[in-house]
Structures are given as C-alpha cells and as structure tokens.
C-alpha cells in the first residue's frame, strides 16, 4: 500500500519523538535510532513541502541541528564498540584498546550533556506544525507535484554520488571516501521514499546501497580510531593492524564501485524514464479510446431532425 510523503514525514516525526526519552537518558540505541530518523526526515521534508505547498526550510534546519548533535555522540559510541570488537580480535593490544575505550567513554559524557541541552533548546513541535501546514515559512507555490520534486531530488542525488565516487578514485583518500558514504546515505533514504510511495521501486538498488554503505561505515570508524592512536603515538603493531584492516575493506569497496556507478546512472535517468513511461501510457490510453468511440457511433440512431421532407415521394 502506497502513502504520501507528508504522511511518511508525520510518521517519521513520531518515530523521532518516540526516541526522545531514550536520548535524554543517553541510551546508545535511542541515539542511533533518532539519528537515523533525522537522516530520513532531511530527505522527506523537501518532498513533503512540495506536496502540501509549504516551504520546509526552517523545519529542515531544525532537523539538521538535531542530527548533528546526535551524530557527535553516535560517533563516540561507534568507536567504543569498535574498541571492544578489536579487544576480542587482538588480545595482545587489549590493554591499549581498553585505555582508548576509557578515554572515549569519558569524552562521551560531556558530549551527551551537550546533546540533551541542544534538544531542550530546539522547538521540535514545530516539525509537526510544518507537516500539518501550520508552518510560518513561505508558501512553496512553484506548481510542482511531489512526484516531480522527488524525481528531481533523485536525479540530483544520483549526480552527487557519481561525482563523489569519481573524486574518491581508486586510491585511498579517507575524506573523499567519507563523502561517498554521505552521498550514498542520502540517496538510499531518498530511494526508501520512492519505494514507500510506490513512485519507483528499482530492483536491488536499496539493498546494494546498504551493503556498500556498511563497508564504508566500517572504513570510516577504523579511520577515526586510527587517527586517535596515531596522534597519541600508540602501539605501532596495533596501528599497522588497523591500517591493514582498512586496506582490506577498501579493496572490498573497489569491487563494488561499478555498482555505485550503475546506481547513480539509474537515478540520473529516473525523471526522463518516468516521463517517457507516462507518455507511453497516455498514448496507449488514447489509442484505446479511438475504437471505443467508433463502436459508440455505430450504435447511435441517425439524427433526422435536419433531413429534407418528402411529400408524395418527391423532395421538397
């Protein structure tokens, strides 16, 4: 069953609100889930704005602020989890990893306090007002349908992903590869919108995006941890191990890079493909109407109101 972007946005706002209590308690799972919710909302809001005819700029900024505050704590949680994983895999470096884990936990405490204060300062109820059409922002008024807006954003995100993949090259550039991850995330959440609204259901695209995103996420976490160890001049053996792990996962990414190019190309073609599909369907519908109209005419009784009168067999 399909649903509209505004309805999806309202549901996702409810999801975000459901995690607020856990965020205030500093719970790892709530912070992660709330962060994902803000990511989804950032892609939904613009499309929903075109549906209800309201600018979602202020609401978007609100969600972005919430997402950034959540992201700061979420990254620390990911690094703590990675330290615990490596402690099991690298017993010889368990002491060094345990020390780093302790530092990360200490760093998390003030970050969690900042997160709670940030959320207290944000008027999150304004999100519900925005989706209900009560937002104080300007009217969109551009005449676009939400499907047109969605198609344009999918095309844009596809182009951004293609550019990021090309710029990352086949050599390991941590920051460039992180940009690939960011663009892939944005595109993936937009594809979710397309699937849930039944505007577009590309085979395997979202599944493939999730797989590559997982690899890129693993690389990013290890790179962040590596930089912390390097800055403190820690165990050279552990640093070498993390570097080797990154190299292995980067090789996995390169094996899937062609799939990213195909994803991006499909997304860039999407608006044109949809327009062509609508034209074909309209042409077929018009072709079906012609014989139906002909059959209707055959069954009609001739109108004799204007026929000439016949008197005595002659035409008068």
Predicted regions and their residues:
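Function-determining surface determinants
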Residues: 1-303, 308, 315
């Amino acid at each position: 069953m399909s649903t509209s972007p505004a309805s999806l946005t309202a549901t996702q706002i409810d999801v975000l609100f459901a995690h607020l209590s856990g965020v205030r308690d500093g719970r790892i799972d709530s912070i992660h889930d709330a962060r994902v919710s803000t990511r989804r909302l950032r892609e939904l809001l613009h499309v929903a704005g075109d549906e209800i005819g309201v600018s979602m700029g202020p609401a978007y900024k609100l969600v972005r602020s919430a997402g950034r505050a959540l992201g700061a704590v979420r990254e620390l949680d990911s690094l703590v989890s990675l330290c615990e994983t490596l402690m099991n895999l690298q017993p010889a470096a368990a002491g060094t990893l345990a020390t780093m884990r302790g530092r990360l936990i200490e760093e998390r405490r003030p970050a969690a306090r900042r997160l709670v204060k940030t959320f207290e300062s944000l008027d999150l109820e304004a999100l519900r007002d925005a989706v209900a059409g009560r937002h104080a922002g300007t009217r969109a008024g551009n005449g676009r349908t939400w499907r047109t807006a969605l198609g344009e954003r999918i095309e844009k995100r596809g182009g951004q992903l293609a550019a990021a993949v090309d710029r990352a090259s086949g050599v390991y550039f941590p920051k460039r590869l992180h940009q690939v991850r960011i663009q892939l995330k944005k595109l993936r959440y937009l594809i979710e919108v397309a699937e849930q609204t039944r505007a577009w259901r590309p085979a395997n695209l979202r599944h493939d995006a999730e797989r590559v995103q997982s690899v890129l996420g693993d690389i990013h976490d290890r790179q962040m941890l590596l930089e912390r160890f390097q800055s403190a001049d820690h165990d050279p053996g552990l640093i070498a191990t993390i570097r080797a792990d990154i190299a292995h996962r980067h090789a996995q990414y390169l094996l899937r890079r062609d799939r990213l190019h195909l994803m991006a190309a499909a997304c860039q073609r999407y608006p044109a493909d949809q327009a062509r599909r609508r034209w074909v369907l309209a042409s077929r519908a018009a072709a079906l109407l012609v014989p139906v109209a002909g059959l209707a005419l055959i069954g009609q009784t001739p109108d004799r109101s204007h026929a000439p009168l016949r008197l005595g067999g002659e035409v008068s």
